[in-house]
C-alpha cells in the first residue's frame, strides 16, 4: 500500500479533533515503518550514484536493507510500545506512545496482506518468517488492480472522515493535494 494511504487511514481511525499532539503522534507512527526506505533510497541514488534498477532489484533485497526494514516493521516492537503506552496513558508521553504505536501497527496491518515477493519480516525479532501474500499492491500478476480498488476506497473513505472531522482550510488543501503524491512522472 502506498504511504499516503497508510497515513490517511491511521488518521481517520485514530486522530481526534482538538488533540494536536495525539494527531502528530498518529501521523508520525503511520509513516515510521517506511522511513528507512525513504532515507535509504535517495541516499543510494543521489549520493552513491546507484541506478534505480540496481537499487530496487538488488540492494533493496540485500540483507542489510532487509534487516533495517524488519526493525522498522516489527509488530512485536510496536506491540510492546503500545502496551507500555497504554499502561502509562495517564502521562502525556504514554498516550503519545500508544497512538504512535497504534498508527504504526495500522500501517503494518495494511502492508501485511499486500506484499508478495517483497514481504517483510513483520514478526522480527521473534521470527524471520515472512507472510508471502497472494496479493500485491503494485504487481499486476498478483492482483494489483483489485488491491488498487480497495486502496482507493480506503483513501476516499478516510479522506471523507478527515474532511468532516477537521474544518481547517489547510487540512482540506492537503486532502485535495495529496492524490498528486501518487502521480508518477
Language-model features, listed with the residues they occupy:
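N-terminal membrane-targeting hydrophobic helices
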Residues: 1-183
Amino acid at each position: 500500500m502506498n504511504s499516503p494511504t497508510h497515513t490517511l487511514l491511521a488518521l481517520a481511525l485514530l486522530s481526534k479533533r482538538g488533540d494536536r499532539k495525539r494527531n502528530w503522534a498518529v501521523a508520525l507512527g503511520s509513516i515510521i515503518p517506511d522511513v528507512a526506505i525513504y532515507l535509504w533510497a535517495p541516499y543510494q541514488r543521489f549520493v552513491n550514484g546507484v541506478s534505480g534498477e540496481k537499487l530496487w532489484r538488488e540492494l533493496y533485497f540485500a540483507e542489510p536493507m532487509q534487516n533495517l526494514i524488519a526493525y522498522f516493521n516489527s509488530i512485536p516492537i510496536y506491540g510492546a510500545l503500545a502496551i507500555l503506552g497504554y499502561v502509562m496513558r495517564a502521562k502525556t508521553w504514554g498516550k503519545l506512545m500508544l497512538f504512535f504505536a497504534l498508527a504504526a501497527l495500522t500501517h503494518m496491518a495494511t502492508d501485511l496482506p499486500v506484499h508478495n515477493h517483497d514481504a517483510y519480516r513483520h514478526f522480527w525479532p521473534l521470527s524471520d518468517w515472512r507472510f508471502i501474500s497472494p496479493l500485491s499492491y503494485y504487481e499486476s500478476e498478483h492482483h494489483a488492480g483489485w488491491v488498487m480498488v480497495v486502496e482507493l476506497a480506503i483513501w476516499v473513505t478516510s479522506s471523507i472522515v478527515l474532511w468532516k472531522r477537521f474544518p481547517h482550510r489547510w487540512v482540506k488543501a492537503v486532502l485535495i493535494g495529496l492524490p498528486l503524491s501518487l502521480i508518477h512522472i
